[in-house]
A protein has these predicted regions:
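Phosphate-binding/catalytic loops
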Residues: 84, 90-149
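Conserved active-site segments centered on acidic
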Residues: 1-81, 146-149
Length: 149
């Protein structure tokens, strides 16, 4: 089983979008039994909060539910548990270092680095552009799944 953890600052916008987009892609490919997919935050600010409403609505526009998801903070144990820890941006990578250290097993990457457009996933918290974030997340998750097949 391949275990993937998507990570952003608060775990209420980008990383849960990636979690549920990837779950949807995996299900549509008939591969659900081969994957465990989750998401987490680097900060404590949003722990216990549901997915931010505009992010939830963007997923729903595409027939994807994130019902029941609440934010949680990543832990050092996540590094041992997951095969891939996928950050949404460079700030997330820096903040993840306190949990994962030097990444000796090379499990950590940026989602967009799996595409032909490396870099950060657009942060809708600052831009308000959930469509741009959707496009980045969909492109990143599609490319990651292709890599892992």
């Amino acid at each position: 089983m391949t275990k993937i953890l998507f990570i952003c600052h608060g775990n209420i916008c980008r990383s849960p979008m990636a979690e549920f987009v990837m779950k949807d892609l995996v299900e549509k490919a008939g591969l659900s039994a081969q994957f465990e997919i989750a998401s987490a935050a680097t900060s404590t600010e949003e722990i216990g909060n549901p997915v931010y409403p505009p992010a939830r609505h963007k997923l729903a526009e595409h027939g994807i539910s994130c019902a029941g998801k609440t934010a949680r903070q990543m832990t050092r144990r996540d590094y041992e548990t997951y095969d891939y820890l996928i950050a949404m941006d460079h700030n997330n990578l820096r903040n993840m270092a306190r949990f994962v250290g030097s990444d000796p097993e090379h499990k950590v990457s940026l989602l967009m680095d799996h595409t032909r457009r490396p870099g950060d996933v657009t942060d809708p918290w600052y831009t308000g552009d959930f469509e741009a974030t959707w496009q980045d997340v969909l492109e990143g998750c599609t490319a990651l799944l292709e890599e892992l097949r």
